[in-house]
């Protein structure tokens, strides 16, 4: 019998890896309602322009769109409401102090189930400029050219 998987990836924010230099990673829980969890299990969510904001010493993920679950009944939820992150007090203080620095933000990278609980991977990030994107693309192209040349030599 095969071992059960403990985590199941629901969504990944690939665009964040392109737009930001990721510095520090953390795993956090999210406070959700039942219909929101069911909507996630059915594969509906969007990370478009989401980030983490701090209010009254608590972390909230803003911009995470979870559409209403079709069979939720009469319960009507705001799909774009801020959702509280479950982090230790020390982690919250550390992140809040780093976000106050100019140019740093916190972005969600992944949304997944771990032991039947919804978790998100968040990262402390610094925004890239347009020329940084171009430099990154040049580096990737050069690396691919080198790989092609090495592969051609070994044949």
Curated annotation (Swiss-Prot):
SUPFAM superfamilies recorded: Small protein B (SmpB)
GO cellular component, one term: cytosol
Gene: smpB
Entries under Pfam families matching the protein: SmpB
Family: Belongs to the SmpB family.
Keywords in alphabetical order: Cytoplasm, RNA-binding
Designated name of the protein: SsrA-binding protein
CDD domains referenced in this protein's UniProt entry, alphabetically: SmpB
Source domain of life: Bacteria
PROSITE patterns assigned to the protein according to its UniProt record, in alphabetical order: SSRP (PS01317)
UniProt keyword RNA-binding, yes or no: yes
């Amino acid at each position: 019998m095969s071992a059960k998987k403990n985590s199941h990836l629901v969504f990944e924010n690939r665009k964040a890896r392109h737009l930001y230099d990721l510095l520090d990673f953390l795993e956090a829980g999210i406070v959700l309602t039942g219909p929101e969890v069911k909507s996630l299990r059915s594969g509906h969510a969007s990370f478009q322009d989401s980030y983490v904001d701090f209010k009254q010493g608590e972390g909230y993920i803003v911009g995470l769109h979870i559409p209403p679950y079709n069979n939720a009944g009469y319960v009507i939820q705001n799909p774009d409401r801020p959702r509280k992150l479950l982090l230790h007090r020390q982690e919250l203080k550390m992140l809040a102090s780093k976000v106050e620095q100019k140019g740093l933000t916190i972005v969600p990278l992944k949304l997944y189930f771990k032991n039947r609980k919804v978790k998100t991977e968040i990262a402390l990030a610094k925004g890239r400029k347009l020329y940084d994107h171009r430099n990154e693309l040049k580096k990737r192209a050069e690396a691919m050219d080198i790989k092609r040349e090495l592969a051609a030599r070994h044949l």
